[in-house]
């Protein structure tokens, strides 16, 4: 299957993923973004070869080396919005607690809400830690999204080149060429202290739990 075909399939699937969870409207934050009533995932899938996540009940196979709580971050190169490369362990928040939010595509409503929530509802954590979003969107698309959404407190990193991040962490969905939906909290020593991979792609991760874990790491430090 060619790369172009995979990207087309991925775009079609991503649109479906985004629309599936967004039937009922929620309230507005006053920032211009209207939150929707999207299910928050209960529990976590497991990463890596042989594991699956669901899309509307249908399994999609994960690819790559599994990551789990207690593992150290594996160094991979990602592309920043200025097209420069950076290692995932060498971002501007190096030496700090970080929340890494992983989304299939920012051009879908579920991913959009996940990213707004990370940016707007982190309870002041953005002043103390680094917030990161990783997706296979191009750096140009990520930059456009951040500007249009007026999100300046999140570091956007693109895995578009060869899904190196997805494969290194067992979060790569090879068929549609996207990443599974996940959130991880990483301590100052690059150890994963919290990881949730949503079992159903149309559900949001529990960012409130991620915020709680991040705050506890700051307090303990």
Tell me what each language-model feature is.
Residues 180-221:
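Thiol-/selenol-based redox modules, centered on thioredoxin-like
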Residues 72, 97, 178-180:
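Short, small/polar residue-rich loop motifs at catalytic or cofactor-binding pockets
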């Amino acid at each position: 299957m060619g790369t172009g075909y995979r990207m087309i399939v991925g775009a079609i699937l991503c649109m479906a993923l985004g629309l599936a969870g967004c039937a009922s409207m929620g309230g507005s934050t006053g920032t211009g973004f209207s939150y929707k009533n999207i299910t928050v995932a209960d529990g976590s899938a497991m990463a890596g070869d042989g594991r699956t996540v669901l899309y509307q009940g249908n399994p999609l196979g994960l690819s790559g080396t599994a990551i789990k709580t207690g593992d150290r971050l594996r160094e991979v190169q990602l592309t920043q919005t200025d097209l420069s490369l950076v290692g995932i362990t060498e971002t501007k928040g190096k030496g700090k607690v970080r929340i890494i939010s992983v989304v299939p595509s920012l051009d879908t409503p579920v991913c959009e809400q996940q990213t707004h929530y990370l940016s707007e509802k982190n309870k002041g954590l953005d002043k103390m830690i680094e917030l990161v979003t990783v997706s296979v969107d191009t750096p140009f698309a990520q930059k456009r999204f951040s500007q249009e959404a007026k999100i300046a407190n999140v570091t956007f990193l693109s895995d578009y080149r060869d899904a190196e991040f997805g494969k290194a962490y067992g979060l790569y969905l090879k068929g549609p060429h996207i990443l599974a939906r996940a959130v991880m909290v990483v301590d100052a020593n690059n150890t994963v202290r919290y990881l949730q991979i949503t079992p159903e792609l149309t559900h949001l991760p529990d960012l409130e739990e991620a915020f709680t874990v991040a705050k506890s790491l700051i307090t303990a430090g």
